A protein has these predicted regions:
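Short, ordered coil/turn segments that flank beta-strands lining enzyme active or ligand-binding pockets
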Residues: 105, 150, 196-197, 289, ...
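Conserved small/polar residues in nucleotide/adenosyl-binding loops
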Residues: 325-331
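Basic, glycine-rich polyanion-binding accessory segments appended to enzymes
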Residues: 224, 232-319, 323-324
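ATP-dependent adenylation/nucleotidyltransferase module used to activate substrates
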Residues: 1-126, 137, 146, 153, ...
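Short gly/Ser/Thr-rich phosphate-binding loop of adenylate-forming enzymes
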Residues: 143
Length: 331
């Protein structure tokens, strides 16, 4: 990002954020030295814990499956970067996301998909505000990943050989249950596995060990494959079902962040993405009187998961993004 902006004539300052465990900053520092640009680190551990880690733990213990990266971008990373920019009198924030900032004819800003669909990161950026977008640059989104690595290799930047990040940064081993237990000092309370009719099928280890659509690790014998359909924190039950019961056409979403439009006044066709790895599927958005949206997909979608971000696109840019809170079984 820094190199591309330098080539476009910008004056660049390198900034990294200290958010969780102490990071090895040698690679970032070496890259800045190679580019002959200033480098600084901004501390953000307290803000990160308050805005991301604590809500993540609370959500999981409530039977939700949160999307912490989406929250972190708006409430932590952009906040801290803007603080640095204001202190230094800098006009723009620039990041290395595989996405592009687009100003539409109606004057609103949105995030546009990267030229490389496989690396596109717009899903995680849906929550940015209009103010944040108006002061942000994302030059990497105009290139594919191999081209970016090639550019970095040509001038010997350490990031050229850096592996892609796959996990949530504060749970690198993907063991959410152990992390939550460590954070709270409390074991998750065991309860009942039940079928869709409420019949007890066995004992579960605690809600934090499960997520919607999960099949492995249930410890339940069945003549047909069974999956987690629902987590019920009120009764401490995990509802199990057969594969076909995981599919839904309708989902209800709230906490909406509108990008391409200020709001929706009637039904709108869109492509809905219900998790980061979801390819996206055609749907219609119906505004509700209480300010929420009903998203009705043309075809049933598997394992819509309360707490996850749902992001809706028109053409190649984000229309709006929100949090999924319920889904209705397919007809």
């Amino acid at each position: 990002t820094a190199l591309l902006l330098r080539r476009q004539g910008y004056e660049v300052i390198g900034v990294t954020l200290g958010l969780w465990e102490k990071n090895d900053l040698s690679g970032v520092r070496d890259s800045c030295e190679k580019l002959n640009i200033p480098f600084l680190c901004r501390e953000g551990h307290e803000l990160f814990r308050q805005q991301v880690v604590d809500p993540f733990v609370k959500a999981y213990r409530s039977g939700l499956t949160p999307s912490p990266c989406c929250i972190c971008n708006r409430r932590v990373k952009w906040i801290l970067l803007q603080q640095v920019a204001d202190e230094l009198g800098v006009e723009y924030i620039a990041t290395g996301h595989y996405a592009r900032i687009k100003k539409l004819d109606n004057g609103r800003y949105t995030v546009q998909k990267s030229v490389t669909a496989a690396k596109d990161q717009t899903y995680a950026l849906y929550n940015l505000t209009q103010e944040q977008l108006s002061h942000t640059l994302m030059p990497v989104g105009d290139y594919d990943k191999p081209h970016i690595r090639q550019i970095a290799e040509e001038i010997g930047l350490p990031v050229a050989t850096k592996h892609d990040s796959q996990d949530i940064c504060f749970v690198p081993d993907h063991d959410y249950a152990s992390f939550i237990t460590q954070e709270t000092g409390k074991e998750s309370k065991p309860g009942n596995f039940v079928d869709e009719e409420g019949n007890i099928m066995g004992q579960h280890r605690g809600l934090i060990h499960y997520t919607i659509g999960q099949r492995k690790g249930l410890g339940i014998s069945s003549s047909t494959p069974i999956f987690v359909k629902e987590l019920r924190p009120q009764t401490n039950e995990v509802v199990l079902c057969k594969s076909e019961s995981l599919f839904s056409r309708d989902c209800h979403v709230d906490n909406i962040n509108y990008m391409a439009e200020e709001k929706l006044t009637g039904p709108v066709k869109a492509i809905g993405k219900i998790r980061y790895s979801h390819a996206g599927a055609p749907c219609t958005l119906y505004p509700q009187p209480d300010g929420t949206l009903l998203a009705q997909f043309d075809e049933p979608q598997r394992a819509m998961t309360p707490g996850q971000a749902a992001v809706f696109y028109q053409d190649d840019h984000v229309l709006c993004g929100c949090l999924l809170y319920t889904s209705d079984a397919a007809d």
